[in-house]
Amino acid sequence: MRVADFSFELPEALIAHYPQPQRSGCRLLSLDGPTGTLTHGIFTDLLDKLAPGDLLVFNNTRVIPARLFGRKASGGKLEVLVERVLDDHRVLAHVKASKAPKPGAELLLGDDENIRATMLARHDTLFELRFDDERDVFTILNAVGHMPLPPYIDRPDEDADRELYQTVYSQRPGAVAAPTAGLHFDEPMLATLQEKGIEMAFVTLHVGAGTFQPVRVDTIEDHIMHSEYAEVPQEVVDAVLACKARGKRVVAVGTTSVRSLESAAKAAENGLIAPFFGDTRIFIYPGYHYQVVDALVTNFHLPESTLIMLVSAFAGYKNTMNAYQQAVAEQYRFFSYGDAMFISRNPRAPQEKVSP
């Protein structure tokens, strides 16, 4: 399968740089997987598309202000993007500098350059850094870090992004990108869903910067997926099994919830799904047989990205590319701060041949 098969033309003007004034005020493009039928609407239409007893699975990760600016003590500006917090004082990070720091190098970080860190070791593309500070990593980042807006949002981060680029139910700090499908849910909508009898469960997947990395191979099967930490606790497993037993749908909110649930399914030695705690490199592309997820709430993704491949595996390649073509024609807003889709799984998708 060629990566180029997942390309589409996207006018720059359709990339959303700011969210809608009201979280649930975005548009919703619904795609019926089995038939390919498209329906245009608004996000709150989701209330009518879900039935009592359906299970919504959210990702409760919280985005950390993971971007730091500074310089090497020896001179030379640099930018640090924390990828993973290892403990109270150590992180793995991407470091952008004219010359990469060597082990033992001292970094001066923050707008006042008053945060000191030491480069301990290099692990492939990531640098292990130790903050030489009494405060823990999260306290330091909250004090001097910048929100790591995606590269396609071409503006500096603003104070408002600390909450806007965050789901209202976020609880577990550790992500460097938001699980953006969840940004559309506000407190009133969550309350209405509960009143309607929609069940809810929460997984954790700390989204890494790798989610924005382009696929650098020509053939999909050659791509090596980045690693992210995920947790699917026993209560989520129980909720999924109970939902299936009552004949209702498991609805994943976002591709990170999909990847968490399907990782837990792959880990199950007996039965449909088992608790999962650890790193996942699951790469879902056409031909994949979904085990758990019946429907999906997701935003519009980048051309040739692993996420549009995941959606194509779920809805079918032709259905997905047609939906994206229609979304562009109807001027939907794309990417993290953009509009949403609601997709039901196409059971014939794994057998479909990918051909533009």
Curated annotation (Swiss-Prot):
Keyword Ribosomal protein assigned: no
Q: One GO biological process from the UniProt record? A: tRNA wobble guanine modification
Question: What InterPro entries does this protein map onto?
Answer: QueA, QueA_dom1, QueA_dom2, QueA_sf
Which EC class, in a word? transferase
Indicate what this protein is called per its UniProt record: S-adenosylmethionine:tRNA ribosyltransferase-isomerase
Report the EC code(s) recorded for this entry.
Answer: 2.4.99.17
Q: What this chain does, per the record? A: Transfers and isomerizes the ribose moiety from AdoMet to the 7-aminomethyl group of 7-deazaguanine (preQ1-tRNA) to give epoxyqueuosine (oQ-tRNA).
What does UniProt give as GO cellular component? cytoplasm
Molecular-function annotations in GO: S-adenosylmethionine:tRNA ribosyltransferase-isomerase activity
Q: What gene makes this protein?
A: queA
The record's subcellular location field reads:
Cytoplasm
Q: In which pathway does it act?
A: tRNA modification; tRNA-queuosine biosynthesis
Keywords assigned: Cytoplasm, Queuosine biosynthesis, S-adenosyl-L-methionine, Transferase
* Subunit comment: Monomer.
Which reactions is this enzyme annotated as catalysing? 7-aminomethyl-7-carbaguanosine(34) in tRNA + S-adenosyl-L-methionine = epoxyqueuosine(34) in tRNA + adenine + L-methionine + 2 H(+)
Carries keyword Secreted?
Answer: no
User: What is a single Pfam family found in this protein's UniProt entry?
Assistant: Queuosine_synth
Family, as annotated: Belongs to the QueA family.
